[in-house]
Structures are given as C-alpha cells and as structure tokens.
Amino acid sequence: MTKADTIFKENITKIMEEGVWSEQARPKYKDGTTANSKYITGSFAEYDLSKGEFPITTLRPIAIKSAIKEVFWIYQDQTNSLDVLEDKYNVHYWNDWEVEGVPANNGDKRSIGQRYGAVVKKHDIINRLLAQLEANPWNRRNVISLWDYEAFEETAGLQPCAFQTMFDVRRVGEDVYLDGTLTQRSNDMLVAHHINAMQYVALQMMIAKHFGWKVGKFFYFINNLHIYDNQFEQAEELLKRQPSDCQPRLVLNVPDETNFFDIKPEDFELVDYDPVKPQLKFDLAI
C-alpha cells in the first residue's frame, strides 16, 4: 500500500465517521438538486517526492494525462479559454463551468470567467516567479496566488479551489531541492483529490527542471475536504478495495534546465501505475 492509499483511506474513514453536514451549499447536481456533503476541515498531507512518494492512489484509475494538460492550459497558455482547452488538449470537463457571454482573455468566445489562467496572465505570475528564483533561489517569497478579488467582481465564474502554491529551495549536500506547498480551499475527496495534487506536483517538477534542481517534498493543505451525498456507496467500495502493489511515480523526460515554456504534456510519464479496476462513476457537483 502506498502512502497515498493510506492517506486516502484514512481521509474517507474520517469524513464518513466524523464529518459534519454542509449547510446552505452552493453546488448543484445536474438535475438541479442541492449537492450536500459531509466534510472535515484542516486536512494536511506530506509527500517526499525525492523518495518516490507521489500523491496518487492505486484504489481507482486517475485521469492523470488530462489533469496535467490543465496545468499547461493555466500556466503556459495562461488563458481562461475553453476553446484552447478543447482544441489544443482535448479536455472537456471544464465546459460545465462555462460563463456565458464572457469572452476569454485571448479573444475567444467561450471562457470560465476571469479565473485561473487569466489571472496568471494578468499578473505575469510565472515569469515573475521564475525571475525571482533565478535572482535568489533561497528567497521566501515564491508564491502563486490565484485569489483575485478584482477578478471575482469583474465576472462570474467558479472561484479557484487550488488557489495558492508556494515554493522553497533547500540544499542538501551537493543537491538542490525544490519543495512545493499547495493550499486548497475546497476539495472533492473521491473525484479530485489526487488529480489536484498530481497537477501541482507536475508544476513543481516543471519549475525544478527549469533550474536543473531535484524535486523535494510536496505539502498539501485542504481547508474543506468533503464527500458528496451521492458518493457514499463509492466511498464504501474504495474502503473495501485492496490497493495494488505498484509504486507509481511521475517522471519528466526532459534534460535539466529545459525552459519552463518548452516543456510539453507528453514529456510527462506515469510509471509503475496499475490501479484497481473497474473505474467508479461519479455524478459531479457543479
């Protein structure tokens, strides 16, 4: 059993046994009914990527390829355009969060509002982050924040769930490591937990490669970790499953010091990944 599997089962058990019910819930199911959930607060996990600990479960298949493509959409393309996400990456699940009548920051007609990639572009976040890491790798101000009140007032749209990332550099002997911390306001435990974690591990790996550093530790804090009320059967099924004996790890197959913007989704490879099947079905809360 991997560390991620252990944490996954512990979180499911804690939510089901100790979680409290949501009140005045915003999300809806596709039939229009309120998507209530049981939740816990203050969830934290630590993974040492340098030792092969990756935040991906083997208890069910995780769509890692499309998840990583979303990272490129946000941080390389730096757009909120659904057309780019579909035409360039063949990713469609953000369509449920389209904000009608709000054009994308690149002029395309369809967007998710002034969110995610649009905020990255607006503040030139990636270029600023890379520049200050270049100037002083040991500075303590390496923060990506997608929480933009001005953008929230400008258009409608889902407010970012994974909204803040921080990076720190450590020297251990002759090696330099990049650590990453992801802060998330809200997380759908069964559907999105490992998707979001692995997305930001991928981002951490891209930044580390840019400088020729090794990836170090990944810290993951979630304020509200929940399971929706139409997912309880799937939760029980996951608790019953025996994890695969594989040890999955994400590999970025480019040379050290490859420019951040030259890395491509196909440069990533998830190796030794043999998750338990069949896949479970989930009706998403929107």
UniProtKB/Swiss-Prot annotation:
It comes from the Bacteria. Signal peptide: none annotated. The gene is thyA. DUMP binds at R140, R141, R185, S186, N187, D188, N196, H226, I227, Y228. It catalyses: dUMP + (6R)-5,10-methylene-5,6,7,8-tetrahydrofolate = 7,8-dihydrofolate + dTMP. Keywords: Cytoplasm, Methyltransferase, Nucleotide biosynthesis, Transferase. Homodimer. This is Thymidylate synthase. GO terms for cellular component: cytosol. InterPro entries: Thymidate_synth/dCMP_Mease (IPR045097), Thymidate_synth/dCMP_Mease_dom (IPR023451), Thymidate_synth/dCMP_Mease_sf (IPR036926), Thymidylate_synthase (IPR000398), Thymidylate_synthase_AS (IPR020940). Pathway: Pyrimidine metabolism; dTTP biosynthesis. Its main location: cytoplasm. It is found in: Cytoplasm. One of its GO terms (molecular function) is thymidylate synthase activity. Coiled coil: none annotated. The lineage of its organism: Bacteria, Bacillati, Bacillota, Bacilli, Lactobacillales. The keyword ATP-binding does not apply. It comes from Streptococcus thermophilus (strain ATCC BAA-250 / LMG 18311). PROSITE patterns: THYMIDYLATE_SYNTHASE. Catalyzes the reductive methylation of 2'-deoxyuridine-5'-monophosphate (dUMP) to 2'-deoxythymidine-5'-monophosphate (dTMP) while utilizing 5,10-methylenetetrahydrofolate (mTHF) as the methyl donor and reductant in the reaction, yielding dihydrofolate (DHF) as a by-product. This enzymatic reaction provides an intracellular de novo source of dTMP, an essential precursor for DNA biosynthesis. Pfam families: Thymidylat_synt (PF00303).
